[in-house]
Amino acid sequence: MSKLKLHGFNNLTKSLSFCIYDICYAKTADDRDGYIAYIDEQYNANRLTEILTETCSIIGANILNIARQDYDPQGASVTILVSEEPVDPRDVDTSEHPGPLPSAVVAHLDKSHICVHTYPESHPEGGLCTFRADIEVSTCGVISPLKALNYLIHQLESDIVTMDYRVRGFTRDINGVKHFIDHKINSIQNFMSDDMKSLYHMMDVNVYQENIFHTKMMLKDFDLKHYLFNAKPEELSAEERERITHLLYKEMQEIYYGRNVPEV
């Protein structure tokens, strides 16, 4: 697509949303509590702020404001307001305090922001634990959130990823013609490295006429030792390893396809 000469600012909003899952098996209630505490500390508000700050650097956005919060008993949230235009570093506020009033921020928040929320959880009896991170990178202008794909998936050690990319609104060229998208895309996969794509099974569900693109990813290789918390495969019987492998694989399939799978 040739470069457009626009009339005024690029008014297209480009949003990339992730659900990233980490799956684990913890045998006892204490182990499950231990996993939740571990993952909660591993992805606390400070660590997530570091990840999102680097994301801003990757996509070429300028940070205006950071709001972050750890929650009791678990979970964290970080929201960063960004702009396309350079800002004076002396005007950037990253301290922890209440942000601007809604009247001062709502117009900007509708355009460009990066946010993440985390959701650790566990099965009450089955030993299965999951950690989900919801991430949204929404930009207005020429900045593309797709540049952050590989970095975010890698940083959050993802077993399963579901992604949505959508372009909303329109912008006008100098002749007054409306443009509802300003770049070529037929799949989110085209913006991933070959190394990343080789690690995952992938499936697309795209609605091209609406500029909506959806991709699901699940790790190809399954190694039980990477999914056990406070345990090693050699400490388990063959029957136990088979049972846990079945539980984990079923859990991953259900999350990947978004539906419960009945036992046969």
Curated annotation (Swiss-Prot):
<comment type="function">
    <text>Catalyzes the decarboxylation of S-adenosylmethionine to S-adenosylmethioninamine (dcAdoMet), the propylamine donor required for the synthesis of the polyamines spermine and spermidine from the diamine putrescine.</text>
</comment>
<comment type="pathway">
    <text>Amine and polyamine biosynthesis; S-adenosylmethioninamine biosynthesis; S-adenosylmethioninamine from S-adenosyl-L-methionine: step 1/1.</text>
</comment>
<dbReference type="Pfam" id="PF02675">
    <property type="entry name" value="AdoMet_dc"/>
</dbReference>
<keyword id="KW-0210">Decarboxylase</keyword>
<dbReference type="InterPro" id="IPR009165">
    <property type="entry name" value="S-AdoMet_deCO2ase_bac"/>
</dbReference>
<protein>
    <recommendedName>
        <fullName>S-adenosylmethionine decarboxylase proenzyme</fullName>
        <ecNumber>4.1.1.50</ecNumber>
    </recommendedName>
</protein>
<keyword id="KW-0745">Spermidine biosynthesis</keyword>
<dbReference type="InterPro" id="IPR003826">
    <property type="entry name" value="AdoMetDC_fam_prok"/>
</dbReference>
<dbReference type="GO" id="GO:0005829">
    <property type="term" value="C:cytosol"/>
</dbReference>
<keyword id="KW-0068">Autocatalytic cleavage</keyword>
<dbReference type="GO" id="GO:0004014">
    <property type="term" value="F:adenosylmethionine decarboxylase activity"/>
</dbReference>
<dbReference type="GO" id="GO:0008295">
    <property type="term" value="P:spermidine biosynthetic process"/>
</dbReference>
<keyword id="KW-0620">Polyamine biosynthesis</keyword>
<feature type="site" description="Cleavage (non-hydrolytic); by autolysis">
    <location>
        <begin position="111"/>
        <end position="112"/>
    </location>
</feature>
<keyword id="KW-0949">S-adenosyl-L-methionine</keyword>
<comment type="subunit">
    <text>Heterooctamer of four alpha and four beta chains arranged as a tetramer of alpha/beta heterodimers.</text>
</comment>
<comment type="similarity">
    <text>Belongs to the prokaryotic AdoMetDC family. Type 2 subfamily.</text>
</comment>
<keyword id="KW-0456">Lyase</keyword>
<dbReference type="InterPro" id="IPR016067">
    <property type="entry name" value="S-AdoMet_deCO2ase_core"/>
</dbReference>
<feature type="active site" description="Proton donor; for catalytic activity">
    <location>
        <position position="140"/>
    </location>
</feature>
<keyword id="KW-0704">Schiff base</keyword>
<keyword id="KW-0670">Pyruvate</keyword>
<keyword id="KW-0865">Zymogen</keyword>
<feature type="active site" description="Schiff-base intermediate with substrate; via pyruvic acid">
    <location>
        <position position="112"/>
    </location>
</feature>
<feature type="active site" description="Proton acceptor; for processing activity">
    <location>
        <position position="117"/>
    </location>
</feature>
<feature type="modified residue" description="Pyruvic acid (Ser); by autocatalysis">
    <location>
        <position position="112"/>
    </location>
</feature>
